[in-house]
Amino acid sequence: MKPSIYSLTRDELIAWAVERGQKQFRATQIWDWLYKKRVQSFEEMTNISKDFVSILNDSFCVNPLKQRVVQESADGTVKYLFELPDGMLIETVLMRQHYGHSVCVTTQVGCNIGCTFCASGLIKKQRDLNSGEITAQIMLVQKYFDDRKQGERVSHVVVMGIGEPFDNYKNVMCFLRVINDDNGLAIGARHITVSTSGLAHKIRDFANEGVQVNLAVSLHAPNNDLRSRIMRVNRSFPLEKLFSAIEYYIEKTNRRVTFEYIMLNEVNDSIKQAQELADLTKTIRKLSYVNLIPYNPVSEHDQYSRSLKERVLAFYDVLKKNGVNCVVRQEHGTDIDAACGQLRSKTMKKDREKVTATK
């Protein structure tokens, strides 16, 4: 199976071309065809010799993904189900915001983090995506814009889809360098957010990278007892270890950390828990932000339901009174399979039923 050429950074593409007897500018031309003209095949690169196009075709594919399902919400949110070369399925989401077009990408097939409220973890991790497969998600959404011919572009990226990004650290970092490259898609680092469930040692590594990319942490509970029950990762990286890494990140980068907090009715949304959360983030208040997220129910996790509006507002009020920077997140795609992993899970179930029916 040939790798996608999207898996190479610009420097890696230059080195690859030079090793094959080409001048550096040839790699620059290829890069422009890929990320500025956004061609879908090497044959469209009209200023590249046929011999070198043949070498490119022997070595790489362009976009390795195949579109299986597209769902569009009334609010303009678009959810894509893509098929990988090995037949596995991943999800990507386009969200139209007032500040631009944001794309949520997937980094793994399945997830091993084991959050008890999440659709992504219903299917265990089967493999990591390589950087080309992650970049390809952005490229296909951008193709959707290009085909519309309205001058739209992917302006923001959130690495919050299926999988734990820091469990696929090397490929995610390569992806970030590709989409941030000023000579390509040029998506600003401050318009990119990577979300982790709390792999403390990788947060420290990320701090040392020197990138301006935003960091979000999926917190979802204000104490170890509850967090260990609803997020298995907390057993390996309890809050003390996690917050030590977060403090290191803030000290090293002077950048704000966003805490994601899904509101689960009568599980993590009490006044007492709001005060616990305020106390937990007290020492990093100036460089932290809490995002209160309405829960998208998952049929397989029927022990959870969405917090009632009055409980969310009461929780929010406690945080604000304690000086916590916070917001209740705007919902997107509520009329489609909005929760991360839902569309993939449903499609896989249908595929299995079709196979069973033909036997």
Curated annotation (Swiss-Prot):
Its EC number is 2.1.1.192. One of its GO terms (cellular component) is cytoplasm. Keywords: 4Fe-4S, Cytoplasm, Disulfide bond, Iron, Iron-sulfur, Metal-binding, Methyltransferase, rRNA processing, S-adenosyl-L-methionine, Transferase, tRNA processing. The active site is at residues 91, 340. It is found in: Cytoplasm. GO terms for molecular function: 4 iron, 4 sulfur cluster binding; metal ion binding; rRNA (adenine(2503)-C2-)-methyltransferase activity; rRNA binding; tRNA (adenine(37)-C2)-methyltransferase activity; tRNA binding. Disulfide bonds join 104-340. Its cofactor is [4Fe-4S] cluster. It holds the Pfam family Radical_SAM. S-adenosyl-L-methionine binds at residues 163-164, 195, 218-220, 296. It catalyses: adenosine(2503) in 23S rRNA + 2 reduced [2Fe-2S]-[ferredoxin] + 2 S-adenosyl-L-methionine = 2-methyladenosine(2503) in 23S rRNA + 5'-deoxyadenosine + L-methionine + 2 oxidized [2Fe-2S]-[ferredoxin] + S-adenosyl-L-homocysteine; adenosine(37) in tRNA + 2 reduced [2Fe-2S]-[ferredoxin] + 2 S-adenosyl-L-methionine = 2-methyladenosine(37) in tRNA + 5'-deoxyadenosine + L-methionine + 2 oxidized [2Fe-2S]-[ferredoxin] + S-adenosyl-L-homocysteine. [4Fe-4S] cluster binds at residues 111, 115, 118. Binds 1 [4Fe-4S] cluster. The cluster is coordinated with 3 cysteines and an exchangeable S-adenosyl-L-methionine. Its main location: cytoplasm. HAMAP family: RNA_methyltr_RlmN. PANTHER family: 23S RRNA METHYLTRANSFERASE, RADICAL SAM CORE DOMAIN-CONTAINING PROTEIN. Specifically methylates position 2 of adenine 2503 in 23S rRNA and position 2 of adenine 37 in tRNAs. NCBIfam families: rRNA_mod_RlmN. This is Probable dual-specificity RNA methyltransferase RlmN. The lineage of its organism: Bacteria, Bacillati, Bacillota, Bacilli, Lactobacillales.
